[in-house]
Amino acid sequence: MKFKKTIIDRARLGVAWRNFTASLRQDLANDFLRPMVPESWRNAVRKKSSPSPTRTSVRKEKPVVFVSYATDESLKGSHRYCGGEKLLNNLVLLLRRHGYEAFMVSLDGKHADWLAEHAPFLSIEEFKIRSARAGDVRFVSSWVKARPFLDECPRFYFWDQELSASSRSHFPDLAALMANHRIIRTAGVNRAVQAFHRCIFETEALAVRQLIDDVHWKPDPSRRIPNRVGYFDEGDHGAAYVRRIAELTKAAGLSLEFVQLSGVEREIITQMQQCGVFMALNIGKSHLWGEGGPMSPQEAMACGTVPVCYDINGPWELIQQDYNGVIARESTPEAMAEALISIYSVPGRLEEMSLRTLEIFTTSHSMEARWPEVSRFLDLPLK
């Protein structure tokens, strides 16, 4: 453990040193060298400099996009209930719906059959052949340890969805890739991840938030059971939290049914459509900054199910407090029960919040609403 920490600390020092020397050179140029250059010369240089091409310029052919997190035999590039895979899969689906050839890549070309709609998969060998034939390509990954894939990519786009990895065990690899200019552009899955990259690497990282496939995630009012509260198994704390929340809401005079959602994506969608409220029990991988999500509150919104969650990074970008959901004041069962009581104890409030959550999702958080972020990230035309 000490050895691993030493490697991470040395990588962080390396990044800090490179940023310091770059800043020193810039200060030297701005404060010492630039005043020595006559203004007339500087104006001449500005006039001769041609503007860089814009991202909306017309391309002769659409690029082919390859997306992967394939790492090794234990992480082949597809396994059940991997939220990161779902986001990458939905990225490929969005690209294909906009007319691009786009593929997921796993070691053997196979995928675990669990999503409502799987994007086409290629094996590493098929990917090598197709990428060699393609004229214009984009390589995308969310996992800097994906060596079988990234070793075949001269440069790639990095969509960081897991700060607990990027800031810790993956940091030396990430720092080396940044230093060697292997990463064309970085995007964070929320503002916290974006800010990390901007601060540490002084790069213009973008934000590409979760992609929820609203072709499949959509409301069905006929299935709604208003007093049903759904939740996922989020770890060892979950069962005790649910028991305590049930006790407190019952003591407040509410008769709520708490149902654990489980199964493959199509089954989860049906179960989510039945819930009046979804409570996200995820307390994050760090008590300070969480993990940047999770996706489930946004999936709930797509179904018109009111999300209630803890304050881990991400929900504040989805939820207007007490308008289309509630972010509990702290990560305790008491705070979650308090949020549920605030919704169910006021007649008509659940129905109002349900309409608002669906409206906000449709206008601001649908897959299509994310296209401007995605196209900017991958240097693609907006239209």
Residue positions per predicted region:
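A charged, aromatic-enriched C-terminal amphipathic alpha-helix characteristic of glycosyltransferases
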Residues: 348-381
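Short hydrophobic beta-strand element within catalytic cores of glycosyltransferases
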Residues: 301, 306-309
